[in-house]
């Protein structure tokens, strides 16, 4: 039996030509870095270097740093990406030329109305939205929100107390995830959710669906391999985020706005109210006000960004404190000194706690939740002798930067003293960037730090955390794009001196 089909010569020529053209398309952009003299891993047709991400972005970036130095080239499907770790180049990309030459990160794919969110808006649109949102992220506004966050901290203490009294080991993500969700709904929408005790709440269920975006989803990989399909999916109203979820949240947020416009007597300090107020603020004289759809987009992206940062960082902090009891004790002593007799947390108290700041900074160095920050070049430029053509993505590998042994002594060691007043000045500003850097850094940085610190204070005022048999030591990281432990962080929670205070 003949295994090779008996096609006419013309058919074979057509098949061969099609395969050659397909190969050319799948590799046409993969010669750029060789042409520029920039090293990097060998890309595969169509896939580029994306399969290496299965090892974990954080791990792959560190391996590349060890092999290629402070600069290398990658290919996300067809998209070339220059990776830089030199502090001067990072400063130029993120600060000096952040407006004139570079714009926001590449869109992930078909975003629908979410493309107007601050994280994805470009150039003048980004400036307009950032200007309108900035007043909501000032120290004055955070002071007003501390009582809301404190209420969430009280609910966290109540939940942890039940586990401590029953001598149970706890999955920290369950408790700090619930705390984070309560903070988001409380500070964003003024809604008291108590998510740990109300898991079936429709608003909560839809927010959790929103947060399940899988960066290795086949649909997302398809967009990476064939970026020209993005406009097609946009036209078909197919997006990255589940349509039923965005539709539910959009309708819910619109109803909230209508309700608030009718009830003008109540004074509210949450982010949503401040975005509504911005639609009629003085800033709108020089900047077009947020549309209702843009207001919804900002609300959804705040949910998305705030949840991962806080709910992931808090378990990492508690793990390090549990495995470094001397650090935990020293931090508890500082908390007790600034807030004696388990006094309520204030914004001024947060600012005073130097050792708490050191612990949080060191944890974010070891475990930056977002392991990369990306910009896109708008025009040809040469930086430090390196030619960067228009359209090229430029990426800073934050995890690799924070773990580079050339700049950090024993980079895998948890050492809060790195960030003491004595040592902090010696740290290069562009070697430690857990929230990015420059004008386009994370607008919610101080908000996230406030949430994290308040939770740590309330927890350590009342409890001590210790490893148990389920605790993975040493901690291993998963291969997900957003930094996560391989296994849930499980610890034993103990009442301090057998007593607790609070609600």
Swiss-Prot record:
Induction: By rifampicin. CDD domains: CYP3A (cd20650). Changing residue 340 to A: In allele CYP3A43*3. It is a peripheral membrane protein. SUPFAM superfamilies: Cytochrome P450 (SSF48264). Keywords: Endoplasmic reticulum, Heme, Iron, Membrane, Metal-binding, Microsome, Monooxygenase, Oxidoreductase. Highest expression level in prostate. Also expressed in liver, kidney, pancreas, fetal liver and fetal skeletal muscle. Its cofactor is heme. One of its GO terms (molecular function) is iron ion binding. It is an enzyme of class 1 (oxidoreductase). It comes from the Eukaryota. Its EC number is 1.14.14.1. GO terms for biological process: cytochrome metabolic process; oxidative demethylation; steroid metabolic process. It is found in: Endoplasmic reticulum membrane; Microsome membrane. It holds the Pfam family p450. GO terms for cellular component: endoplasmic reticulum membrane. Chimeric transcripts, characterized by CYP3A43 exon 1 joined at canonical splice sites to distinct sets of CYP3A4 or CYP3A5 exons, have been detected. All are possibly produced by trans-splicing. CYP3A43-CYP3A4 chimeric transcripts exist in 3 different combinations: CYP3A43 exon 1 joined in frame to CYP3A4 exons 2-13, CYP3A43 exon 1 joined in frame to CYP3A4 exons 4-13 and CYP3A43 exon 1 joined in frame to CYP3A4 exon 7-13. Belongs to the cytochrome P450 family. Exhibits low testosterone 6-beta-hydroxylase activity. This is Cytochrome P450 3A43. It comes from Homo sapiens. The gene is CYP3A43.
């Amino acid at each position: 039996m003949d295994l090779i089909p008996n096609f006419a010569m013309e058919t074979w020529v057509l098949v061969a030509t099609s395969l050659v053209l397909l190969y050319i398309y799948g590799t046409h952009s993969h010669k750029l870095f060789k042409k520029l003299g920039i090293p990097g891993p060998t890309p595969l047709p169509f896939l580029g270097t994306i399969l290496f991400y299965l090892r974990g972005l954080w791990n792959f970036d560190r391996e590349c740093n060890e092999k290629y130095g402070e600069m290398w080239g990658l290919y996300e499907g067809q998209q070339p990406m220059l990776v830089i770790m030199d502090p001067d180049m990072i400063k130029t990309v993120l600060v000096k030329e952040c407006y004139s030459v570079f714009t926001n990160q590449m869109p992930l794919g078909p975003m629908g109305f979410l493309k107007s969110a601050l994280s994805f808006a470009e150039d003048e649109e980004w400036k307009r939205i950032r200007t309108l949102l900035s007043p909501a992220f000032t120290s004055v506004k955070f002071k007003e929100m501390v009582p809301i966050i404190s209420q969430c901290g009280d609910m966290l203490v109540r939940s942890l107390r039940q586990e401590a009294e029953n001598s149970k080991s706890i999955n920290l993500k369950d408790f700090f995830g619930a705390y984070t969700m309560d903070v988001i709904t409380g500070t964003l929408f003024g809604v008291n959710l108590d998510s740990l005790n109300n898991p079936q709440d429709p608003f909560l269920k839809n927010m959790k669906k929103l947060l399940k975006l899988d960066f290795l989803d086949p649909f997302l990989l398809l967009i990476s391999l064939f970026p020209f399909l993005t406009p097609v999916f946009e036209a078909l109203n197919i997006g990255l985020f589940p349509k039923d979820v965005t539709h539910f949240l959009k309708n819910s947020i619109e109803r909230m706005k209508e309700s608030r416009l009718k009830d003008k007597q109540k004074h509210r300090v949450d982010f949503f109210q401040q975005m509504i107020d911005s639609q009629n603020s003085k800033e709108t004289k020089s900047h077009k006000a947020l549309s209702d759809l843009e207001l919804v987009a900002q609300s959804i992206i705040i949910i998305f960004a705030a949840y991962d940062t806080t709910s992931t960082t808090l378990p990492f902090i508690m793990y390090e404190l549990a495995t470094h009891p001397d650090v935990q004790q020293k931090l508890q002593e500082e908390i007790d000194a600034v807030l004696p007799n388990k006094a309520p947390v204030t914004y001024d108290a947060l600012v005073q706690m130097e050792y708490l700041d050191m612990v949080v900074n060191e944890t974010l160095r070891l475990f930056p939740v977002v392991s990369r920050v990306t910009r896109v070049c708008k025009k040809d430029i040469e930086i430090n002798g390196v030619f960067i053509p228009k359209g090229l993505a430029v990426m800073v590998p934050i995890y690799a930067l924070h773990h580079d042994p050339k700049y950090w002594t024993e980079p895998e060691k948890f050492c809060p003293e790195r960030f003491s007043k004595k040592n902090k000045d010696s740290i290069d500003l562009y070697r430690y960037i857990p929230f990015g850097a420059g004008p386009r850094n994370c607008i919610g940085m101080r908000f996230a730090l406030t949430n994290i610190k308040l939770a740590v204070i309330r927890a350590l005022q009342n409890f001590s955390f210790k490893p148990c048999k389920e605790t993975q030591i040493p901690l291993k990281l998963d291969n997900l794009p957003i930094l996560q432990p391989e296994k849930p962080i499980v610890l034993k929670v103990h009442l301090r001196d057998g007593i607790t205070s609070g609600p």
